[in-house]
Regions:
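Conserved helicase RecA-like core
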Residues: 1-239
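Intrinsically disordered, Lys/Arg-rich low-complexity segments
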Residues: 239, 244-246
Length: 246
């Protein structure tokens, strides 16, 4: 009886390992149907899925494939891994961010909890969401952030997927994502609906391969900045949009 199939966040489903389950769903579908597939990025895997699932599809692109929104200013600060929390607190005190809210992405649940504790000890208004927190707790944290009751929300990629926060001025990548496409998803939380936004990444030497992959994906070299007093002991090699690491 199914007439319309809608696949939203298709790339994330594949990233999370649901390829087999999707194939099982597809095999049970009637041939005569309408299929709508939405994805913030368009990898080769997504292209293959679309080719197998869709017949004579109409493609609608709101931005170039895998491109970051032009309304978002992107830059990075190089820093040693062990000083990232200290650097973030320093930037909160010295940058002209005012009382604007920040969405901070961390790659692990343990890392989310640790950064939340570091910020709380420094007197910063912060909440956190990740997959180990009960759904009611995550929803409450999100509602508090949307209401402006906390300045910073720390989150993992999965927990923050699909967040729609009005007028969010700044996204911080405390850790670079393992999957380059997630960078586009992350910074897409800001600079929405014609507004401008900022996206800052704190990058250590261990993340140079991830940085190169991100720059190759978005086809641009991110502007670098060394913060005085936080110059890394372990240099982050120069990268560019070619994706090559020296």
């Amino acid at each position: 009886q199914l007439q319309v199939l809608v696949l939203d966040e298709a790339d994330r489903m594949l990233d999370l390992g649901f390829s087999k389950e999707l194939d099982e769903v597809f095999s049970a579908l009637p041939r005569k149907r309408q299929t709508l597939l939405f994805s913030a990025t368009f990898s080769e895997v997504i292209r293959q899925m679309a080719g197998n699932l869709l017949r004579d599809p109409l493609s609608v692109e709101v931005t170039p494939r895998n491109a970051a929104a032009k309304s978002v200013k992107q830059w990075l600060v190089t820093v040693d891994k062990k000083r990232k929390s200290e650097l973030l607190l320093h930037l909160l005190q010295t940058q002209n961010w005012g009382q604007g809210q920040l969405l901070v992405f961390v790659k692990t649940r343990k890392g989310v909890d640790q950064l939340e504790q570091d910020l709380q000890r420094a007197g910063v208004s912060v909440d956190a969401i990740h997959g180990d927190k009960p759904q009611p707790t995550r929803l409450r944290a999100l509602e508090r952030f949307k209401a402006g009751e906390v300045q910073i929300l720390v989150a993992t990629d999965v927990a923050a997927r699909g967040l729609d926060i009005h007028d969010l001025p700044l996204v911080v990548n405390f850790d670079l994502p393992i999957v380059a496409e997630d960078y586009v998803h992350r910074i897409g939380r800001t600079g929405r609906a014609g507004a401008t936004g900022l996206a800052l990444s704190l990058v250590c030497a261990d993340e140079v391969n991830q940085l190169a992959a991100i720059e190759a994906l978005i086809r641009q070299t991110l502007t670098r900045h060394d913060e005085a007093g936080f110059e890394p002991d372990h240099r982050v090699p120069l990268t560019d949009a070619s994706g090559q690491v020296p």
